[in-house]
């Protein structure tokens, strides 16, 4: 399945329509370079979307190198997998990438953020939302929301985010049985 976003070029450039695939980056910050984050691979496989990319980093890398790599990839949406060994590190990266790309939605998931999503969203104002639970179905549906393929956002389960007016929206959990 290939999904295209159609948009008009800025006036004066080219009035023809341009097709562009929305890029979604699933980023994992591992404890060591020999470790691999299976969650991001599971999310990508379930989403069945060629526009989803995976970026794997380690807590031993310089934050600036990770920020540079994320910036060079130019994702439209950034999703990060949070665990006890990388949460502080990811929070620092998120705050910096939020300054570099304030228009880019940033989503977090994983056991270290899903139990108290409201506090995470309060602490990290540049984060759009937190995915809860297993995540596969929720991630796929959030991708569809951003592509305007999902008619009723209220039907998506397993996340908490901030509405446009910064009020809280909490969806019910979802059974993500594969």
Regions found by a protein language model. Give the residues of each.
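A short, charged helix-loop
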Residues: 172-178
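Nucleotide-activated donor-dependent transferases that construct or modify glycoconjugates
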Residues: 23-32
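Short acidic-aromatic active-site loops that bind/stabilize oxyanions
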Residues: 32-33, 83
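A structure-centric signal for secondary-structure junctions around beta-strands
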Residues: 21-23, 37, 153
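Short N-terminal binding/cap micro-motifs at the start of the first secondary-structure element
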Residues: 33-39
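Short, Lys/Arg-enriched N-terminal segments with co-localized hydrophobic residues
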Residues: 3-21
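Glycine-rich beta-alpha loop elements in corrinoid/cobalamin-binding modules
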Residues: 5-10, 39, 43-46, 50-172
């Amino acid at each position: 399945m290939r999904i295209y976003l159609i948009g008009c070029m800025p006036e004066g450039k080219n009035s023809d329509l341009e097709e562009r695939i929305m890029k979604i980056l699933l980023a994992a910050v591992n404890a060591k370079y020999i470790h691999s984050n299976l969650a991001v691979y599971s999310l990508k496989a379930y989403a069945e979307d060629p526009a989803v990319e995976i970026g794997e980093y380690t807590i031993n890398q310089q934050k600036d190198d990770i920020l540079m790599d994320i910036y060079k990839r130019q994702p439209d949406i950034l999703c990060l997998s949070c665990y006890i060994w990388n949460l502080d590190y990811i929070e620092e990266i998120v705050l910096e990438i939020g300054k570099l790309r304030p228009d880019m939605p940033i989503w977090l998931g994983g056991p270290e953020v899903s139990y108290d999503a409201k506090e995470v969203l309060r602490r990290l104002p540049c984060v759009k939302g937190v995915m809860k639970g297993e995540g596969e179905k929720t991630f796929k549906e959030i991708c569809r929301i951003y592509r305007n393929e999902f008619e009723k956002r209220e039907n998506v389960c397993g996340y908490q985010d901030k509405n446009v007016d910064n009020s809280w929206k909490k969806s019910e959990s979802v059974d993500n049985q594969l």
